[in-house]
A protein has these predicted regions:
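Glycine-rich, positively charged N-terminal anion/phosphate-binding segment
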Residues: 34-51
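Short beta-strand elements of ligand-binding domains
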Residues: 61-62, 92, 111-114
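Alpha-helix capping/helix-boundary segments
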Residues: 96-97
């Protein structure tokens, strides 16, 4: 089973692959559903594909907006460009875009996006008959339904296994349109995440009088889903015939992407190694608790979710750790590493490391010097690079993190 990770920009793409993803999905500056996710220029996409292929890994490009007429302009040449740079596939949700892809870039594999709401085997078979090589199933499909679809249709199936959930059916939401008077449209890449807002109730005969719904003093989070987490169910996903496990999060941090990928990499590899002897290790789940997240749920995997799949207490996710630094270079000959600051830290404090191999251990911030060779007591400046003395083995791209207060 492929491990597929989000890549909101070049740094996230490289970190995802280095921490164990088999493939990444990303968007260009147009035609994707995360207009505010950073995204890639054409030149960056070409570089990303070359980098991934050098590592023996894959890149999928999202072209999954639900377009209006004006959105179609230039799409044919864009798809042809993706074919020319040898992207491994495009993700598409719209039949018209699918047609353009077949005409303009016939050698470019097409994966059907979850936005297409493929929730049954007849729909999946129809997409296959039209030329799709993979279908990303709707998030509303259960594990048993996944297995049944795979038995009936010989095609690659991709499913979301971790990350934020949309409150609407496979993302077909108009809340952003409503709250912005049509200026921000979710299905054209401009979601404002209105499902995370705080709401109160107004009775129509009493305009201007707002009533709480007995959750807290801020209102009610009636659309606020918990986050999906399927790390405890890797065997069931593989046995159901899932070809690719997808992690949500093109707008999440570098730290989030790396840590989540590392945990799922270990779980998937462990199942393939141990088979029937496989068991879920507590440190995998602990790692997922250390990233920004809401309480976890298995959503639709085993049954239609009830009220327990919603988070009623608050809309903001937990953020138990701060990402404070990234190792850029390791110099074993003199026991130093070059670290790029991501949050304030100081010499002498004990922090935690996460390496690209997925190893986790504490380390003391050693003697620091700045780029001018001057001693530094702390690292207060965003993205400043410092040399740190350490006896630990900290390879490039190791993450330094610190537990937040409380």
């Amino acid at each position: 089973m492929e491990l597929l990770a989000p890549a909101g920009n070049m740094e996230k793409m490289k970190m995802a692959l280095l921490y164990g993803a088999d493939a990444v999905y990303m968007a260009g500056k147009a035609f994707g559903l995360r207009a505010y996710g950073g995204n890639f220029t054409r030149e960056e996409m070409k570089e990303a594909v070359e980098y991934a292929h050098f590592m023996g890994k894959k890149v999928y490009i999202t072209v999954n907006i639900i377009p209006r007429n004006e959105d179609l302009e230039g799409l044919d040449t864009y798809l042809k460009y993706l074919q020319d740079i040898h992207a491994d596939a495009v993700l598409i949700s719209d039949l018209g875009v699918f047609d353009i892809a077949r005409e303009a870039a016939p050698d470019l594999p097409v994966h059907v996006s979850t936005q297409a709401s493929a929730a049954n085997w007849r729909t999946v078979r129809r997409w296959k008959d039209m030329g799709a090589s993979r279908v990303v199933l709707a998030r509303e499909v259960s594990l048993s339904e996944m297995a049944d679809i795979r038995k009936r249709v010989n095609i690659e199936l991709e499913v979301f296994g971790h990350g934020a959930l949309c409150i609407s059916w496979s993302g077909r939401c108009l809340l952003s349109n409503y709250f912005t008077n049509g200026k921000r449209q979710s299905n054209r890449g401009e979601c404002i995440q209105a499902c995370r807002f705080k709401y109160s109730v107004m009775e129509e005969s009493r305009p201007g009088q707002y009533f709480p719904v007995e959750e807290d003093e801020h209102g009610t989070y009636i659309f606020n889903s918990k986050d999906l987490c399927m790390i405890d169910h890797i065997p069931e996903l593989i046995e159901a015939g899932v070809s690719s496990l997808k992690i949500e999060g093109r707008m999440k941090s570098v730290y989030y992407v790396a840590a989540v990928v590392a945990a799922y990499r270990k779980a998937i590899d462990s199942y393939y190694e141990l088979g029937a002897e496989f068991s879920v290790r507590p440190e995998w789940r602990e790692e997922l608790e250390k990233v920004s997240h809401r309480p976890y749920t298995t959503a639709f995997a085993f049954q239609n979710p009830d009220h327990s799949a919603q988070e009623y207490m608050k809309s903001q996710p937990e953020q138990p750790y701060d990402f404070i630094g990234l190792v850029l270079e390791q110099h074993k000959e003199n026991g130093t590493v070059k670290v790029q600051q991501r949050n304030y830290f100081k010499a002498g404090e004990v922090v935690e490391c996460l390496t690209p191999a997925g190893d986790v251990f504490p380390v003391t911030i050693g003697h620091l010097t700045n780029k001018d060779g001057e001693e530094a007591a702390a690292a207060p400046h965003p993205l400043e690079e410092l040399t740190m003395v350490t006896e630990e083995d900290l390879p490039p791209y190791t993450i330094l993190r610190r537990r937040t207060c409380g």
